UniProtKB/Swiss-Prot annotation:
It is found in: Cell inner membrane; Cytoplasm. This is Protein translocase subunit SecA. It is an enzyme of class 7 (translocase). Monomer and homodimer. Part of the essential Sec protein translocation apparatus which comprises SecA, SecYEG and auxiliary proteins SecDF-YajC and YidC. Its EC number is 7.4.2.8. Part of the Sec protein translocase complex. Interacts with the SecYEG preprotein conducting channel. Has a central role in coupling the hydrolysis of ATP to the transfer of proteins into and across the cell membrane, serving both as a receptor for the preprotein-SecB complex and as an ATP-driven molecular motor driving the stepwise translocation of polypeptide chains across the membrane. It comes from Burkholderia ambifaria (strain ATCC BAA-244 / DSM 16087 / CCUG 44356 / LMG 19182 / AMMD) (Burkholderia cepacia (strain AMMD)). May bind 1 zinc ion per subunit. It holds the Pfam family SecA_DEAD. Belongs to the SecA family. Keywords: ATP-binding, Cell inner membrane, Cell membrane, Cytoplasm, Membrane, Metal-binding, Nucleotide-binding, Protein transport, Translocase, Translocation, Transport, Zinc.
Amino acid sequence: MTTGFLQKIFGSRNQRLVKQYQKTVETINALETQIEQLTDDQLRGKTDEFRQRVAAGESLDKLLPEAFAVCREASRRVLKMRHFDVQLIGGMVLHYGKIAEMRTGEGKTLVATLPVYLNALAGRGVHVVTVNDYLAQRDAEWMARLYNFLGLSVGINLSGMEHEQKQQAYASDITYGTNNEFGFDYLRDNMVYETEARVQRALNFAVVDEVDSILIDEARTPLIISGQAEDHTELYVRMNALPPLLERQIGEEKADGTGVEKPGDYTLDEKSRQVFLTESGHEKAERLLAEWGLIGEGESLYAPQNITLMHHVYAALRAHTLFYKDQHYVVQNGEVVIVDEFTGRLMAGRRWSDGLHQAVEAKEHVKIQSENQTLASITFQNYFRMYAKLAGMTGTADTEAYEFNEIYGLETVVIPTNRPPKRIDKQDQIYKTAKERYDAVIRDIRECYERGQPVLVGTTSIENSELLSHLLKQAGLPHEVLNAKQHEREAAIVAEAGRPKRITIATNMAGRGTDIVLGGNAEKQAAFIEADEAIPADEKARRIKQLHDEWETLHEQVKAAGGLHIIGTERHESRRIDNQLRGRAGRQGDPGSSRFYLSLDDPLLRIFAGDRVRSIMDRLKMPEGEAIEAGIVTRSIESAQRKVEARNFDIRKQLLEYDDVSNDQRKVIYQQRNELLEAHDITETISAMRHGVITEVVRQFVPEGSIEEQWDVPELEEALRNDWQLDLAIQEMVNESSSITADEILDAVTTAADEQYEAKVAMVGRESFSAFERSVMLQTVDRLWREHLAALDHLRQGIHLRGYAQKNPKQEYKREAFELFAAMLDAIKQEVTRIVMNVQIQSPEQLEEAAEQIEERTGHLENVEYQHADYAESGAPVANVAAATAATATADMVGSAMTHGHAGELPKVGRNDPCPCGSGKKYKQCHGKLS
């Protein structure tokens, strides 16, 4: 109450910020007359003047009013577009490292030019980040005219570009590209073997378009560069036969033994997208696997030698029960292609991890591709937090303002619209069944079509869009379908979606980034005429004028019919996605309307609010085909959405807390790697490693400060001879001296190792040997880092089970991850020293050949896959994602953990310990019974 009272007096934080920026807008407007007087050359010359002032120490904040005024005038001359006052406010919000929420059609692309121009003056590079290559190329080509006029260079960073093109793009003042490509370039730069092979500069300032999509929707999806690992193709095929033989259990067993409506072999948790085998399911699976000869008679699935099978059992079950064709993936050209659940786009080339993709391929009877090993990975959360300054813009950020602030330290500022909005958002209509809902949708579309009003229908999946398309064909209504299967055409379809009688079906936010203009997009058609050299100039002018006249008529016709009407056929889990769909109507003060049609069969209602709404409908005795339209139901749905949003936020936050551990380690490894690349001579580093390793070896057999009776000299001699190529008669030294100490033995071995090393260097020359050492060290760091990443993933998969032992899983993860990291650093020293001391050299040519072989073995950038696999989607390590993942560690994982000193063997489970399956029961009452 007090807060509301104070807000009335002082205004909200948002209002105060906008008011503050308004004063700067007045300063910019006061400069307009003066700037208008400048010639084109004088206006262009302002850029050099500003650069000199920045170099002399003037801050960008102080330069802002003049730079914005110059950019606005240049835009007016080059693009024939003058920034509105609210767009200047948006530009300031971005410059100060905040998120600008601007409604659809308010000109976000133009707004970005202001802070981008200002920050590019510092000469440290500015990245403009978009969601796909099409938008990156479109915006770069469109705005390059303005930036080039002002004397700034513009680069485009697209996937598949040549190395030199990428370097050129990053060297430009302003670089446009996609979030994926910027992230992958960062990872690739930290996998190179020469400094000249890197493409990125230091990460200075990024403006992220559709910031909610990139920093929130995709925050759970790490970028992964991976290579092929061991082949388990045959096992996936055989496991694919298992799920059809198992039955789903309906209902969860309670403590008193009740709650199961229909017994079965597995249960599903649709919220967390996990599957769990029941006791009978385990018994049945073990019996079938024994019949197929995959496990021994009477063996348990939890036996150490069978853990890899457990991984395959769960992968096959999840593929059959939780992932559906044309909803989560499509089969195209004999390949399983993932569908992005947020945009409905196909994500070609991306694969689910943890064997799920192979299990889906086995289910669809297409060629099974090998499992991959992670070579490098980073989340968008940790990548974008590396920028010195980060800003973003979107039409819908306010519902996620808390998360932006909590995770990225970004404040959200809602920018006022240039004209007051006129869109009417109607109440949701809820039907009992999906059929009744679709009947109502078709009726609404027909009414709009008959009065000449354009309609945009939003669906949540390709399957639903094709179903609706089929129903519209039956109803004889012409329409366009915009989904992941046709996104080459999407910009063209969206541009024309505002014409009279136009019906467009779109999955979620396909076509996002392209405005729907009432009456159609005359500018696009005019551009085609302008580009046609066969048409004479006067004919071009006549046709373009005719186009604009026709557009004026159509524009008024659509406005009179009520503007664009938005129909949502289902509520999304996130209110923000619903708001994005609604936001396509009512741009720049145009009329428009929106309505959502729901049914009790929708996943959101069924899982979170179905019983409550169904009881309301039953009490009201609703006849078939009748909808419920009430505020209480809409509020109930929004409450369900808030629950899902809160849960997703918790998952993202938890993922970040766990990823921060590997991120800190990643920074250390990448920093050391870069120092290694840039160092002219690494002799001192190699020497320190050698002395450290030799000391460890000697101390193992001749402990420091010990007496002769405690020494094991024969074993030391054998270890030095076999492992380090040092043939020393230490026993003779001991026999000849009555007072030799442990330190003197260490000095003797160290001196011998140094002499052996110097002899090799003298044979081939310091420069050649140093190049060989660098290759060895880089290859070793990369290989052990890859194994370490796998070990961290596998540690994270089972770490939540520590909660049953009254331990904090996060603290345990941090502690064990640190131990793994320390073990990896020791392993790097051991491995590098072993290779350098064991290499046999006769000539410099032989050394070069050895270095080439090492680099060939590490030619990982030639045969890799770039994935953006959703961890939470694929059951990968989010700490509290269902306990069943505890059992999905493969035999490789165990081997990897053992290599890193994580565990000597798989721990034996005590009868009274919590069962490893995560049921919460004691082992003797759960899978102990099965063993």
